[in-house]
Amino acid sequence: MTTIDAVLARLSEAEQQLDDAEAPLSGWQLDPIYMGNQRLSRGDLDRVSTTRPIEVLHASGHILNVNTKALSLSGLLQSGINHPSTPLDHEGLPTGELKGPEVMMSVAGYVGFDRSLTDADAQGLQDFAKICVRAGVTTVTDLASRLSDETVEMMQIVTSAEDFSARLVPLKLFIGLSPKDLIARVGELAKLSTDRLRLGKIKIVADGSIQGFPARMRWSGYYNGAPNGLWYITPEQLSEIYHLALEAGVQVHTHINGDQAI
């Protein structure tokens, strides 16, 4: 889709198929690059519905647009917010564009976009292993799993089955823990490793994406003068994790986007 009107028309079509007037409506794969970098606002999404929460996830996965109802439910529809993750309109209220995992997760539960849905389930792992056989792949990874106790238990059961035909290497995503607690957690996970389930590694996302401008860029910055992007983890925390991980012999995979994050 190359216009905001086209996006809204498709959302309206989907909205009409929902019986519950308060049920959330979710969309994904939005990319303003194809729209002349026009930004979707809560006012735009309010044209689809003001009674149900609506969200549209960007193709980059780093930005979420929501309507006024979603902001209200999450407590973000207020003045006084002063953070680059939450752009404000001329009235000092959030525009509805939310950048980065922390602010996105604060509204996710109200719009049907719970990050736990991105974790693998048993059937998904079984089906994926069959695809691996067809492609001749023996070892696969999940590079951003929260690895909750429930998820780890599920992975243990699925990968221990005689007909599971791949080796799975999921990485613990750094979110919601201190560096020391993170290292301790992956140390505990490593003890649960088996031949077909290799645990005990870390995944860090350092900054936002270049699409939408939340990546951290060196001088001279973005071509259009947009403010520099977001650190998803402070450089000080990142350094602490690296030092602790090296001491503990833990592998860390770091995802970066902007050249300043390098």
Regions found by a protein language model. Give the residues of each.
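Divalent metal-binding segments
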Residues: 1-184, 204-261
